[in-house]
Amino acid sequence: MSMLVVGMSHQSAPVALLERLSMDDTVRNDTCEVLIQKPSLSEAMIVSTCNRLEVYTVTNSFHTGVQDVVKVLASNSGVDEDELRGYLYVRYADAAAEHLLTVTAGLDSMVVGEQQIIGQVRTAYQLAAERGAVGPRIHAQIGRAHV
């Protein structure tokens, strides 16, 4: 079981596409529940801001995990899977953990060093934790990021 991040940001996708994928708290909660019901995924947390949408999961199968996340995002947004794949980035295992640290430090923000993102990640974590969607792996990574 390894951490997997599937996402897009202002650096990889046009704002119009990010807006189509944007999720309010209710949609985020529902999406986390759908994700953790997939056999390949055991934990899920979604960071959704005006500049990024990132799905943090724990998977037992890299390719199946990525495919499951993409299918759920396409279903939620109505955006075709092939279109999504053109803008998504994927990070796995150590690279996923490093990405979370980079994001929470504000190093991947439109304005480098901005601190609003740490609160947004904290909110995403709290929402997912309240729904029982996070477990020991995401919890440990959030702790390492000092969120």
Q: Which residues fall in each region the model found?
A:
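Glycine/serine-rich phosphate-binding loop and adjoining beta1-alpha1 elements at the start
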Residues: 83-146
